[in-house]
């Protein structure tokens, strides 16, 4: 058995920075020393990005992950969609949107079949998905549907802060109506389970943020803390011995978490968690989907059309996502036999 896990890396939006950061992340030897990276995407687009990235490896096309060539200076690729190149950086089309979805579903199917240990995704463009007629708003929903998963959550993780979201992509005005005792408690428990199983923590410490200023200030600024969040915390505590505390005032809980007091913070809505997270981990943060039967990590940034094709893209988030996928594969014992 090859000791290095096989990691499928989807190219993401082919007219964004995905192709460039793949090239720069795979330049050198460090990634190859830890895993076998298989790029799922368009070889012509990757070739087009070589002039931008300043790195021109050999592209090895493979029909299966097992027959790839995994050594520095060579990038093994699998291409399940019609050729795209040449593309125009920063200009999505229905064809680029369709290719993105094909690459993602292929990686999911490979992971579900055990052909790869984990999948790592580069950023996609939701507008291009819509142009292609996709029914999905983004990665998380697509992965959940493809794997038949109803219970899932988004975690953003770095070495100083981890946040998990109860609600994800929805208008702020809709958040209070989407919160429930069951939804909050389930997110808390999923966070605890994932910290144990995928991050190797025996006794995780989870903080739960309030929704309102000062966590409601005893009902002066809202009743969601008393009506929903506190009962959810109590319900979660009945099902686990992990340390679950809260509801914490949102303006202070992240300070304590960044200081090492908590292993993760459960947040009520998207920007509550992502603003503090990106202040600390804008360059090296990782998005990982909890609850899936497969391992999926991702960069925590977008397609960056404004710098696509300029050679200025930073690959640190992708490198961190690859490292996290490797670590999760080790924790879960997911490794192809090849």
From Swiss-Prot:
Pathway: Cofactor biosynthesis; pyridoxine 5'-phosphate biosynthesis; pyridoxine 5'-phosphate from D-erythrose 4-phosphate: step 4/5. Signal peptide: none annotated. Its EC number is 1.1.1.262. One of its GO terms (molecular function) is NAD binding. Substrate binds at residues 139-140, 278, 287, 296. Its main location: cytoplasm. It is found in: Cytoplasm. The keyword Oxidoreductase applies. Keywords: Cobalt, Cytoplasm, Magnesium, Metal-binding, NAD, NADP, Oxidoreductase, Pyridoxine biosynthesis, Zinc. SUPFAM superfamilies: Isocitrate/Isopropylmalate dehydrogenase-like. The active site is located at the dimer interface. HAMAP family: PdxA. Homodimer. Catalyzes the NAD(P)-dependent oxidation of 4-(phosphooxy)-L-threonine (HTP) into 2-amino-3-oxo-4-(phosphooxy)butyric acid which spontaneously decarboxylates to form 3-amino-2-oxopropyl phosphate (AHAP). This is 4-hydroxythreonine-4-phosphate dehydrogenase. The gene is pdxA.
